[in-house]
Design a protein with these regions (language model features):
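Beta-propeller and closely related beta-sheet repeat lectin domains
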Residues: 22-24, 86-96
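Structural WD40 beta-propeller signal
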Residues: 29, 98-100
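Glycine-rich, often proline-containing surface loops adjacent to acidic residues and nearby aromatics
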Residues: 100-107
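Beta-propeller domains
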Residues: 1-17, 27-88, 108-143
C-alpha cells in the first residue's frame, strides 16, 4: 500500500479565478467535469446566468483544463431564498458535495435561528441531489 507522507504547494499551479464567495467544496464527476459549491457569495460576474444575487449556496460546473478552464452557472440548481430581514436569511448552507456514478449529492445545513441572534448554531440538515449531473435537482425523497 502507498502512503502519503507529505504535500507541498506549487504556486505556479494555482489559478485565481476571481469568484465572489467562500468554501468552494469540489467533486470530480463521471463526466470528467468538476463541480463546486460556493457559500455566501454571488459567483462569477463574467459567467452566463450571473444575476448578482447573493447565495448562501450555489453549485457551478468547471469546464476544461487549467489554465483554460471556465465556470458554468447551473440553471437547474434552485435559487434558495435569501431575504432582507434576519428571519428570511441564512436558510441553507452547502457544506459538501460529492459525485457518485451519474449523480451529484449536496449536503445543506440550516441554523436554529438567524445569526444576528445569540446562540445561533447549525442544527438541521438536508440532502439534495441531481440525477443528471447538475441539470435538475431534487430533495432526498425525490420531490422537486
Amino acid at each position: 500500500m502507498t502512503r502519503i507522507v507529505g504535500i507541498r504547494t506549487l504556486d505556479e499551479t494555482i489559478h485565481r479565478m476571481g469568484g465572489i464567495g467562500d468554501n468552494w467544496y469540489t467533486t470530480w464527476a463521471a463526466n470528467d467535469r468538476l463541480y463546486t459549491s460556493l457559500t455566501d457569495g454571488t459567483g462569477f460576474p463574467d459567467v452566463e446566468g450571473y444575476t448578482g444575487m447573493f447565495h448562501n449556496t450555489r453549485v457551478f460546473a468547471i469546464n476544461g483544463n487549467p489554465p483554460h478552464h471556465s465556470f458554468e452557472y447551473l440553471h437547474g440548481f434552485p435559487d434558495l431564498p435569501f431575504g432582507d430581514v434576519p428571519e428570511e436569511k441564512y436558510r441553507y448552507y452547502g457544506f459538501g458535495i460529492i459525485a457518485l456514478d451519474d449523480r451529484l449529492y449536496h449536503f445543506l445545513t440550516t441554523p436554529n435561528h438567524p445569526f444576528e441572534y445569540e446562540g445561533s448554531r447549525f442544527v438541521g440538515c438536508k440532502l439534495v441531489y441531481s440525477p443528471d449531473l447538475g441539470e435538475t435537482w431534487l430533495n432526498q425523497d425525490g420531490s422537486p
